[in-house]
Structures are given as C-alpha cells and as structure tokens.
Amino acid sequence: MRFAILSVHIAAASVGLLAGFVALYAAKGARLHRRSGTLFVYTMVAMAVLGAGIAAVWNVGPEVNIPVALLTSYLVITALTAVTPAAERSRALDVGLLLVACGVAVFMIGSGLAVATDGARHRVPAFPFFLFGAIALLAVVGDLRVLRSGARAGASRIARHLWRMSAALLIASLSFSVQLPKYLPKSLRLPWLLALPLLAVLVTMLFWLWRVRVRRPVRGMVIAAPRGALVTETA
C-alpha cells in the first residue's frame, strides 16, 4: 500500500515539475503556458495531499512535510485565483486560504525558534522552518492587501500569479534536489548540479518580476483567461 501511494506521489511530482518548467519558460499567455500551468496546479495539489498523507501515516518528518504540503497547495491555488476573474472568485475561499497560510507561517516560525533553541527535529535544522515560514508570511501580507483593497489588477495581478507559481515550483525543485542524490551514483552527486533547478527557477522568477514591475506595461501577457478567452495587457 505504501509503495503504491509513494509511486503515485513520485509520478505526480515528476509530471508537476515537468509541467512547471514548461510553464515557466513557455511564451506567457500562450496555450502551452496556460495548459502546462493548469496541469502544474493539479499535480502539485495531488503531490502535496499524498505527501502529507505519507508524512502523517508513516511518520515521515510530519512536522516539516505536512505544513510544506499545505503551503505548496496554498501557493498554487492562490496563484490560480490571482488570474481568475473577480466575478468568479469566492471571498470565503480567499479567507479560508489566508487562514491556512497564517497557520503555516505561525507553525513554521515557531518550530524554527524551537529547533534553534532545543536542537534539530528529525535531523532538520532551523533554517528550513524559517524559510518556509517566511514564504508563508510574505503570502499572508499579500492576501491581506487583496482582502482589504480588492483583487489586484494589471502588473500587480501578474506579479502575484508569477511569484506564487514560482515559489511552489521552487519548493518542488528543492524536494527533488534533496531526494535525488539517493538514486544517483556518487560521481553525479555534485552540489552545483543539484542546485541547477533551484537556480533556474529563482533567476527566471526574478527576471519576470523585474520585467512586470519595472518594465511596465507588458505587451501580450495574459492577466486573466476567463473561459478560454485571451485577455492581455497592452501597451
């Protein structure tokens, strides 16, 4: 049973990573970008749910893996709602997702402080707790702004979508880089090689955020796609 669930988890993660990188480098707003991005969202949620279940049932670092699974699901779902037309969005869903992010932020930062003072839990140092807690806290700030001022528009909307999708891909890539050495020959366990996916996501995310926020307006980039229609930001 565990092997079957783990196999589906790994398969979802593999498909999700591939779809995520395709969406990251595909022409923004094109059909390939939208379809691969949607596939990335679905597979990341599936991967996260299965990962949380594995962590809870078989005690595989639950204090880290369960909140990270919640954070990953939260990031891709809110990235998707960021480009959903306001008329099709639910405020109750937005509030519920905000509470999830708040819970993750409080738990991870609190756990990080506990690990820093009492020693590592399950051989996990304090840094990952603080890292994921900071990501969740940053997302909470963005959600509060949306709930207070309404849905973002234009470049702000695109930036919200971009960084959340990229952060989820970064988390998936980090997990991949941590687990991959177990299956590689010793000669290929090179730190710079394992860090390449992380660097690729981080650099590409920063580039697009710079392009969206500094080089505005962005011609031909989709800011919403209601029911298959293409809505673009024009100069």
Label each PLM-derived region with a short phrase.
Residues M1-A235:
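Alpha-helical membrane insertion/targeting regions
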